[in-house]
Amino acid sequence: MTHQTHAYHMVNPSPWPLTGALSALLMTFGLIMWFHFNSTALLMLGLTTNMLTMYQWWRDIIRESTFQGHHTPVVQKGLRYGMILFIISEVLFFTGFFWAFYHSSLAPTPELGGCWPPTGIHPLNPLEVPLLNTSVLLASGVSITWAHHSLMEGHRNHMLQALFITIALGVYFTLLQASEYYEAPFTISDGVYGSTFFVATGFHGLHVIIGSTFLIVCFFRQLKFHFTSSHHFGFEAAAWYWHFVDVVWLFLYVSIYWWGS
């Protein structure tokens, strides 16, 4: 910041947006190859490229914000607006899935047997694993709030404990969801019910994995004393994202698991 007469961060040229876009392309084609030809080579390459991009991009941002002091209050304000707009875009993303579900379920066509769930589909019991998943995510919402309050009050160890509990609950949710998918009596190819169910809950599961990764990074950063009560936007963004994931799950549970069954 020595020869700078403004509070904005002039970012150095970075290769990570390019490698990130490449990894997204590889993962998309990899998913198609896996679905149609049962080959996971391209998908694994895409995931590896994505992991490397995430690691190196996060490393650069941590260096610029924590060690070089580029994240001034003005920059943080811009980041906050960016995160809010990103979450709004995600809301619209999930709106499309809910639209597809309600479009199909509110007026089932004769091909579906004129009823919902369609003839031949045995839906999952909403009072079994889905209800446990709901409790797990609601508990994680409480623990992330505990972590935030602990950080604001300077209780570092309490914050680490709460963050660890949140991550553990996120991983537990993912394992429960995976076991539910494995044991489900229908598949993604079982008509509109299977496709809307697996795409909506699958994308939510992906967001839980992303949120858990975000929180794991925050956990290791807190171990290295990167956050203070006044400078912790990385953690705040992760907490906002986690609450968003919580709320989306409540809508999924009420719409697809409970009402849809």
UniProtKB/Swiss-Prot annotation:
Primary location class: mitochondrion
Name listed for the protein in its UniProt record: Cytochrome c oxidase subunit 3
Residue spans, topological domain Mitochondrial intermembrane: 35-40, 106-128, 184-190, 257-261
Membrane topology, record value: Multi-pass membrane protein
Side Mitochondrial matrix, residues: 1-15, 67-72, 153-155, 224-232
Localization in the cell: Mitochondrion inner membrane
Annotated family: Belongs to the cytochrome c oxidase subunit 3 family.
Role according to the record: Component of the cytochrome c oxidase, the last enzyme in the mitochondrial electron transport chain which drives oxidative phosphorylation. The respiratory chain contains 3 multisubunit complexes succinate dehydrogenase (complex II, CII), ubiquinol-cytochrome c oxidoreductase (cytochrome b-c1 complex, complex III, CIII) and cytochrome c oxidase (complex IV, CIV), that cooperate to transfer electrons derived from NADH and succinate to molecular oxygen, creating an electrochemical gradient over the inner membrane that drives transmembrane transport and the ATP synthase.
Membrane-crossing segments per the record: 16-34, 41-66, 73-105, 129-152, 156-183, 191-223, 233-256
GO MF annotation: an example: cytochrome-c oxidase activity
Assigned EC number: 7.1.1.9
Assembly and interaction partners: Component of the cytochrome c oxidase (complex IV, CIV), a multisubunit enzyme composed of 14 subunits. The complex is composed of a catalytic core of 3 subunits MT-CO1, MT-CO2 and MT-CO3, encoded in the mitochondrial DNA, and 11 supernumerary subunits COX4I, COX5A, COX5B, COX6A, COX6B, COX6C, COX7A, COX7B, COX7C, COX8 and NDUFA4, which are encoded in the nuclear genome.
Record's GO cellular component terms: mitochondrial inner membrane; respiratory chain complex IV
Gene, per the UniProt record: MT-CO3
UniProt KW keywords: Membrane, Mitochondrion, Mitochondrion inner membrane, Translocase, Transmembrane, Transmembrane helix
Catalytic reactions on record: 4 Fe(II)-[cytochrome c] + O2 + 8 H(+)(in) = 4 Fe(III)-[cytochrome c] + 2 H2O + 4 H(+)(out)
GO terms of biological process kind: mitochondrial electron transport, cytochrome c to oxygen; respiratory chain complex IV assembly
